[in-house]
Regions:
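N-terminal membrane topogenesis motif
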Residues: 1-41, 218, 232-256, 434-464
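Hydrophobic alpha-helical transmembrane segments
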Residues: 139-146, 172-223, 414-438
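Interfacial segments at transmembrane-helix termini and the short loops linking adjacent helices
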Residues: 55-58, 126-145, 277-280, 341-371
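Helix-loop junctions and terminal segments of transmembrane helices
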Residues: 78-95, 164, 286, 290-314, ...
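Transmembrane helical elements of multi-pass membrane transporters/channels
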Residues: 26-46, 171, 175-178, 182, ...
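Signature of the first transmembrane helix
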Residues: 2-11, 19-82, 122-123, 251-274
Length: 464
């Protein structure tokens, strides 16, 4: 049924897409379960590294949190490309069998050249990058950011291809394997004396491991269709789509995710410039705990995007869907914010240790700030589902202003967090001023059914 929906009954789509048939609900549930495990392992990594890294080891956990925030901002392109690649794969636009292999080989060669180039730039600019991120004592860790982003792009593309082939099992395993490898390798390298740099090195190493795994799984899919194509003869097929053209098609989701990533992560980097080493580590741990509702918003986004797309296609008002998604955030925020209000210190102390609890007083304010950001995230997803892009410039101006304002904010965690809250409130005001406008909707075609939500590109989820 999925093939019929995405192809709208057209002939000529390769039979290799039949891999998507079967229990799609079970596959989706398995992938969702893998995401849950991924997030649980990521949370465990945060707790392990917060306790393992001491403040006298190159800035301790505060430096690692800043480096991770830097990477998360860089990583958003990969998230958008993964979704776009999966869509193109389902529609058969990447080729099949040897044609698909040719496309992936060309893209991988381009990514290898790109990764080498940005790695050279990152090494040459390691001192300015370290200074900007606030990790002056970890210049080689700072130099890993751009190479890690290049590896992440390659991994995201490979995952997208596997998603397009319906191999959700491989995608799910790679999600869990990535976080598990990052935790194990990072912890070992940090424990043997490499400190913050060792802990951060686990990130690109985990990407390399999962790239090899995904490439092997993809090779099996290609080999499975090679026999059917062997008798066709002719020259080797060329790549079906260039990587540059592929990236251009995903520009709006990429821009939206960059804005969200900056609003979500730049405060930890700014904190490294405003606080002492010990306080920056404490703030980093507190900020990680405060962002729990962002994950709730991502889950609500899975519901919001297709439903908004469906209503848009049928000419209905999509705003009630946004209201329902916001209701999910509201319901979940009540117990979370109550815990932040009355048990902030015990919570941070239990999770990260007593040495990371100095900024626990700011947890409620930060919790409010990132609850607001969770709502902004849904508004941005809503606008992108409606194929609106004008708002991106206005929200981007807020994201640009945030680091400027935070670098001049209070040196006390609660005052600093209040500035974060004010910025998030402005961002939400801007996003919702665009989202709540009725605007034109696409009418249903006369005499025929409305276009399906599956015809409209889904919007990738943010991370972090």
């Amino acid at each position: 049924m999925l093939i019929k929906r995405v192809t709208r009954g057209r002939e000529g789509v390769s039979t290799s897409l039949a891999d998507l048939r079967g229990s799609e609900t079970a596959k989706a549930a398995g992938l969702a379960g893998a995401m849950i495990v991924n997030n649980v392992i990521a949370l465990g990594s945060t707790v392990v590294f917060a306790r393992l890294l001491k403040d006298n080891q190159g800035g301790g956990y505060g430096s690692l949190a800043a480096l991770v925030s830097y990477f998360l901002i860089l990583s958003v392109v990969g998230q958008a490309l993964q979704v776009a690649t999966a869509r193109e794969g389902v529609l058969g636009h990447l080729g099949t069998g040897a044609g698909l292999a040719a496309t992936v080989r060309q893209w991988s060669r381009s990514m290898a050249v790109f990764t080498v180039a940005i790695s050279i730039v990152s090494v040459l600019l390691r001192h300015p990058i370290a200074s900007a991120v606030g990790v002056k004592h970890n210049v080689w860790a700072a130099a890993l950011g751009l190479p890690a982003a290049g590896l992440w792009l390659e991994l995201s593309i490979l995952r997208g291809v596997l998603q397009g082939l319906g191999d959700y099992q491989a995608v799910g395993f790679s999600l869990m394997g990535e976080q598990g490898a990052r935790l194990v390798m990072g912890a070992i390298l940090a424990a043997v004396g490499l400190g913050v740099t060792g802990a951060y090195l686990g990130t690109p190493l985990s990407f390399i491991a999962m790239c090899l795994y995904c490439a092997r799984r993809l090779q099996r899919h290609v080999q499975a269709t090679a026999g059917a194509q062997a008798g066709q003869g002719g020259k080797a097929p060329a790549a079906a789509l260039s990587l540059v053209a592929h990236v251009k098609r995903a520009w709006a989701p990429i821009a939206g995710l960059i804005v969200i990533a900056v609003l979500q992560n730049i405060d930890i980097i700014a904190a490294k410039h405003r606080f002492s080493t010990s306080m920056a580590s404490s703030y980093g741990a507190t900020a990680v705990a405060a962002k729990v509702l962002i994950w709730v918003a991502m889950g609500a986004g899975f519901y919001l995007v297709p439903e908004v797309s469906r209503r848009r296609a049928s000419g209905e008002d999509p705003r009630p869907i946004l209201a329902r998604a916001l209701g999910i955030i509201a319901v979940c925020s009540v117990p979370v914010l109550l815990i932040f209000a009355f048990a902030s210190h015990p919570l941070i102390k239990a999770a990260f240790g007593a040495s990371k609890s100095h900024a626990s007083g700011s947890l409620l304010v930060l919790g409010l700030a990132f609850t607001v950001l969770a709502c902004t995230y849904l508004a941005i997803q809503y606008l992108l589902a409606l194929r609106r892009t004008l708002f991106l410039l206005a929200v981007a101006l807020v994201a640009i202003a945030e680091p400027i304002l935070l670098l001049n904010a209070s040196r006390k965690p609660t005052g600093f967090a209040a500035v974060v809250l004010a910025i998030q409130a402005v961002g939400a005001l801007v996003a919702f001023s665009f989202a709540l406008r009725r605007g034109p909707v696409a009418p249903a075609p006369p005499g025929g059914p409305a276009p399906r939500a599956s015809d409209i590109e889904p919007i990738p989820e943010a991370v972090g």
